[in-house]
Regions:
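Anionic-ligand binding patches
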Residues: 1-142
Length: 142
């Protein structure tokens, strides 16, 4: 069995919100509420100290074996204002900036597939880190 979850960890907020993005304030928030709440909490955090990361954790369990965990991390920064590239259900896409690519996560997902494949995100990185283990399971079954 394979399961995964993803969270956003903001350095200046001690790793908040983690996997509780949607219920960060204790109730189910809209995308706009999440963006506003994040930017309000970060309003006094100076540039250069606005680091954050998306973290995906894959959990793999087979039969009675212990659970194996695999991380994928995508580092970036939280902008002071959201950019227009938005997608319903992805509140951090317009404010999560990827300095090495000079674009937000929302802009990244608008790029051609070849570009996206060449620049794996947290989800792809988690899967890539699990591949050797998955291959070993396949070999053991053969």
């Amino acid at each position: 069995m394979i399961a995964d979850d993803t969270g956003v960890e903001i350095d200046a907020l001690g790793g908040e919100p983690g996997i509780k993005v949607r219920r960060w304030k204790g109730y189910k928030m809209t995308d706009e509420e999440i963006i506003h709440y994040c930017l309000e909490r970060m309003k006094d955090v100076p540039e250069g100290q606005r680091g954050a990361q998306f973290r995906t954790v894959l959990a793999i369990i087979q039969n009675d074996s212990p659970v194996k965990y695999f991380d994928g991390i995508l580092r970036g920064e939280i902008l002071t204002n959201p950019l227009p590239a938005r997608r319903e259900g992805m509140p951090f896409w317009p404010i999560f900036y990827l300095p090495n690519l000079k674009m937000t996560l929302g802009q990244f997902h608008d790029q051609p597939m070849e570009f996206q494949v060449a620049n794996p995100t947290h989800r792809e990185l988690a899967v890539l880190s699990a591949l050797p283990y998955l291959r070993s399971l396949h070999t053991a079954l053969m």
